[in-house]
């Protein structure tokens, strides 16, 4: 571990020096000296020197408006470079992530040694493995795409420098390139000028596929196959591709008026166009490689020329022309041209798979397996993973939009107001219409704009090639009729197959009622016939945590999942739980392995479907090597959770969790909902109002333009508290509940739960992570600089609570300090703090200046505004998450 720290620190130090040289060249020695002084004061302040802490505050408070931006940019860019160095070291030869494929082999060996597990059972579990990662734009990823490309190349240079056999000339060339990249990054504006459109967000997702996943997935499957062969002597079938990628970019219209039916249609076409582009590159390589003449009769027949000397090349050239004609058609459609569909248009994966697989089988049969298992196998696996759609999309819409659409139809037909009907009457009407052969909507009817948009979206889903839409997700689902309503609207649009429709249960009450809703649905014969033994349910993490606090929310999520698993098992239904986790702890984020093993037994039998959000996509899938590491981690955790499920919790533990949940929820809501001073304190102690100015994503920050905390989306709510380092949503109520239960005499049981129950130990681990990133003196400084003195007592109360919560968690975990069992993460946080602290202090100063200017009725100072945006991006980089 120490070797890794020193290697990482030396890279961080080298990149820091290159950045310093760049700043000196660009702005002169004086600015660099100022930055260096601030860095040294910050380091000394972190080491406990109070005099230097005061000097740090005074230096940053006294910066002129002209100095603000260069200083903010220096520390923000340094944190971006630190993140690159850390990401590289997770996959470097002596890094943590590089060991993940080996960890997979260790998992296989551990499973083999279990007395009650046969090798056949392990191979069967492996064969049914299913992992679907849903990329979402919520864009907490605030780094511009142009900067990301430069940072990826920095990573590549670090990798080259690790080679031991470099000549002096080669070393000098790599260092020269690094200097160029650091200079390019410095001279590039890191803040977007405009909010991205939903199409921009989708393009960002396609860039992740092109730059990382396209290479990473086949490489991961090669490594997986090698590990399985080493452990069991078993070769994975060619069509075994347990990983799929779906996207919400261009499909998630919940609270986002910018995502329309036309946008979804455009993104679907753009995605298919990008797929043709990437497959054309693969086919070009295969045309070059597959020059052999010996083949099976099937290949001869497929190539259409019995005399062909190079039959494989003929087939590849035919595929190339089919891809090119499809690409040209899609390019025309994207420009709005009305075109006749070409006869050979690619709309289904089988059109690519069958010719490629025929060639694969022929090469194997003719003794050329070594060639078959090269580029051709990689392309076959890409067809299975990405295929013609490239990334499938989910459509997500709020339940009330469907209710309002159907109510408009029933009123027009003279049937009354659907919205005012009882749940039983709604269900009876919906089932009657679902069984009816006539259309629901009359031809001459003109719907309102809102209803037309809902119906048009369903039509887009019906027009899309089958398999392009992965699921229809209903946010704020509360009743069986919410699910039946969507099935009726999809039927009306012309969908003649059972598209997965997933209710999303996201508030505390909805999670508690989830099992009742699904039980009622599964008791409807028509519904059971439709779903053919498969059901997807989405569990919301972020909104439930905002509603009730993390402790109560995580317990409600656990119980909802447990009840749904048992209900579906009893009904003979395969349940896929879709986890709507965020990157931050307050939105359900946790290290993948720990998070999966802490779920209820049986929760992964139907596979894992999970959202990957914003900046976490770049951290986990930004490079092919990182992709391999992340997918290996998920694979091992799913297998382990399915074959060695955690024990059912003891009855007394459930009782303790009920108590913890009740106490924590009461305290959390006592502050957030009921304390008269809480909202004014939140608005002044955090940059919540200023965040709205940041061009973060296509979706508005609030569900309603007016309103308090409850109307704020979960992401800006978390983001704001992350910025001022109080991290409040990720801990409020949890530690106090633990303290209360200890005082009730249950410390021994809490320690046993921490030791023997993965669900509980993961909760505590997540709290420790948050506490490590929180900072009392910085949170206090924000109060002193920004908050009215009348609200200071509330701030002090919250900080005292945080301090007491930290002690409670350390007592139960029997640790002297935070993150004792994860020194690598503790080291990473410590390394960043030296650079994040000045950004936090500077941010408080900038907020102060900006608000004073506003109060005086003056025009905002562009230098202050720009520097403020840079500090927000910089702190996000330092915390390694936004919302």
UniProtKB/Swiss-Prot annotation:
Q: What class of enzyme is it?
A: lyase
Gene Ontology terms describing biological process: carbon fixation; oxaloacetate metabolic process; tricarboxylic acid cycle
Any one GO molecular-function label of the UniProt entry: phosphoenolpyruvate carboxylase activity
Database matches in InterPro entries: PEP_COase (IPR021135), PEP_COase_bac/pln-type (IPR022805), PEP_COase_Lys_AS (IPR018129), PEPCASE_His_AS (IPR033129), Pyrv/PenolPyrv_kinase-like_dom (IPR015813)
Listed A to Z, the keywords are:
Carbon dioxide fixation, Lyase, Magnesium
Annotated catalytic residues:
138, 546
What's the cofactor?
Mg(2+)
Look up the EC number in the record and give it: 4.1.1.31
Return the GO cellular component terms, semicolon-separated: cytosol
Please list every transmembrane segment annotated in the UniProt record, as residue ranges.
none
Q: What Gene3D superfamilies does this protein map onto?
A: Phosphoenolpyruvate/pyruvate domain (1.20.1440.90)
Catalytic activity, reaction form:
oxaloacetate + phosphate = phosphoenolpyruvate + hydrogencarbonate
Q: Which family does it belong to?
A: Belongs to the PEPCase type 1 family.
Function as written in the Swiss-Prot or TrEMBL entry: Forms oxaloacetate, a four-carbon dicarboxylic acid source for the tricarboxylic acid cycle.
Fetch the HAMAP family from UniProt.
Answer: PEPcase_type1
Protein name as annotated: Phosphoenolpyruvate carboxylase
User: To which species is this protein native?
Assistant: Erwinia tasmaniensis (strain DSM 17950 / CFBP 7177 / CIP 109463 / NCPPB 4357 / Et1/99)
The gene designation is ppc
């Amino acid at each position: 571990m120490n070797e890794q720290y020193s290697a990482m620190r030396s890279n961080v130090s080298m990149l820091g020096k290159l950045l310093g040289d760049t700043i000196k060249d660009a702005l002169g020695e004086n600015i660099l000296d100022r930055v260096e002084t601030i860095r040294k004061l910050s380091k000394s302040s972190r080491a406990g020197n109070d005099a230097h802490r005061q000097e740090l505050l005074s230096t940053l408070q006294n910066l002129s408006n002209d100095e603000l931006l260069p200083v903010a940019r220096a520390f923000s860019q340094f944190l971006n470079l630190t993140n690159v160095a850390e990401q590289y070291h997770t996959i470097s030869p002596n890094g943590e992530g590089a060991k993940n494929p080996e960890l997979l082999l260790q998992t296989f060996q551990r499973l083999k040694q279990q007395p009650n597990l046969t090798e056949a059972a392990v191979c069967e579990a492996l064969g049914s493995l299913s992992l679907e990662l849903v990329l979402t734009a919520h864009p907490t990823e605030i780094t511009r795409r142009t900067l990301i490309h430069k940072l990826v190349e920095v990573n590549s240079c670090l990798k080259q420098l690790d080679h031991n056999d470099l000549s002096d000339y080669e070393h000098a060339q790599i260092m020269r390139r690094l200097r160029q990249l650091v200079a390019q990054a410095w001279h590039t504006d890191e803040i977007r000028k405009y909010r991205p459109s939903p199409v921009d967000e989708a393009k960002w997702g396609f860039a992740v596929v092109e730059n990382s996943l396209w290479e990473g997935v086949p490489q991961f499957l090669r490594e997986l196959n090698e590990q399985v062969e080493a452990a069991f002597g078993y070769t994975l079938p060619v069509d075994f591709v347990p990983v799929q990628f779906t996207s919400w970019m261009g499909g998630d219209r919940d609270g986002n008026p910018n995502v329309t039916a036309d946008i979804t249609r455009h993104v679907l076409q753009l995605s298919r166009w990008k797929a043709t582009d990437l497959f054309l590159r693969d086919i070009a390589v295969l045309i070059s490689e597959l020059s052999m003449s010996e083949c099976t009769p099937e290949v001869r027949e497929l190539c259409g020329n019995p005399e062909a000397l190079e039959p494989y090349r003929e087939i590849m050239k035919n595929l190339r022309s089919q891809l090119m004609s499809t690409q040209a058609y899609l390019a025309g459609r994207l420009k709005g041209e009305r075109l006749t569909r070409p006869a050979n248009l690619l709309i289904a994966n089988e059109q690519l798979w069958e010719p490629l697989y025929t060639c694969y089988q022929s090469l194997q049969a003719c003794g050329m397996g070594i060639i078959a298992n090269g580029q051709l196998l990689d392309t076959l696996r890409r067809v299975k993973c990405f295929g013609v759609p490239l990334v499938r999309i989910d459509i997500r819409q709020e339940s009330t939009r469907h209710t309002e659409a159907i109510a408009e139809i029933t009123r027009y037909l003279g049937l009354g107001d659907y919205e005012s009907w009882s749940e039983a009457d709604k269900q009876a009407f919906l089932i009657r219409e679902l069984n009816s052969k006539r259309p629901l909507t009359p031809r001459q009817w003109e719907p309102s704009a809102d209803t037309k948009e809902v119906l048009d979206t369903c039509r887009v889903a019906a027009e899309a090639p089958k398999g392009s839409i992965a699921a229809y997700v209903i946010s704020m689902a509360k009743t069986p009729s919410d699910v039946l309503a969507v099935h009726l609207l999809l039927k009306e649009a012309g969908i003649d197959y059972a598209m997965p429709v997933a209710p999303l249960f996201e508030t505390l009450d909805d999670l508690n009622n989830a099992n009742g809703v699904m039980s009622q649905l599964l008791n409807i014969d028509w519904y059971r016939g439709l779903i053919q033994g498969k059901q997807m349910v989405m569990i919301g993490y972020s909104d439930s945590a905002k509603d009730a606090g993390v402790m109560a929310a995580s317990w409600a999520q656990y119980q909802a999942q447990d009840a749904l698993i048992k209900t579906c098992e009893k009904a003979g239904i395969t349940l896929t739980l879709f986890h709507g986790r965020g990157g931050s702890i307050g939105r359900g984020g946790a290290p993948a392995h720990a998070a999966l093993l802490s779920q209820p037994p049986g929760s992964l039998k139907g596979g894992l479907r999970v959202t990957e959000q914003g900046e976490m996509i770049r951290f986990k899938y930004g490079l092919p090597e990182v992709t391999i590491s992340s997918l290996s981690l998920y694979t091992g955790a799913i297998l382990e959770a399915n074959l060695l499920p955690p024990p059912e919790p003891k009855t007394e533990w459930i009782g303790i969790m009920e108590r913890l949940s009740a106490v924590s929820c009461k305290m959390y809501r006592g502050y957030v909902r009921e304390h008269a001073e809480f909202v004014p304190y939140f608005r002044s102690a955090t940059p919540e109002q200023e965040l709205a100015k940041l061009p973060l994503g296509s979706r508005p920050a609030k569900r309603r333009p007016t309103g308090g905390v409850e109307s704020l989306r979960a992401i800006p709510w978390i983001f704001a508290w992350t910025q001022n380092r109080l991290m409040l949503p990720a801990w409020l109520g949890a530690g106090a509940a633990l303290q209360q239960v200890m005082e009730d005499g249950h410390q021994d049981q809490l320690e046993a739960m921490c030791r023997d129950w993965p669900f509980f130990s993961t909760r505590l681990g997540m709290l420790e992570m948050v506490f490590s990133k929180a900072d009392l003196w910085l949170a206090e400084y924000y109060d002193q600089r920004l908050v009215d003195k009348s609200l200071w007592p509330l701030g002090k109360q919250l900080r005292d609570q945080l301090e007491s919560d930290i002690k409670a968690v350390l007592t139960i975990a029997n640790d002297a300090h935070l993150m004792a069992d994860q020194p690598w993460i503790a080291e990473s946080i410590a390394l960043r703090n030296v650079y994040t602290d000045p950004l936090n202090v500077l941010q408080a100063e900038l907020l102060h200046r900006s608000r004073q200017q506003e109060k005086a009725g003056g025009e905002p100072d562009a230098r202050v505004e720009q520097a403020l945006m840079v500090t927000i991006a910089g702190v996000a980089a330092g915390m390694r998450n936004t919302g």
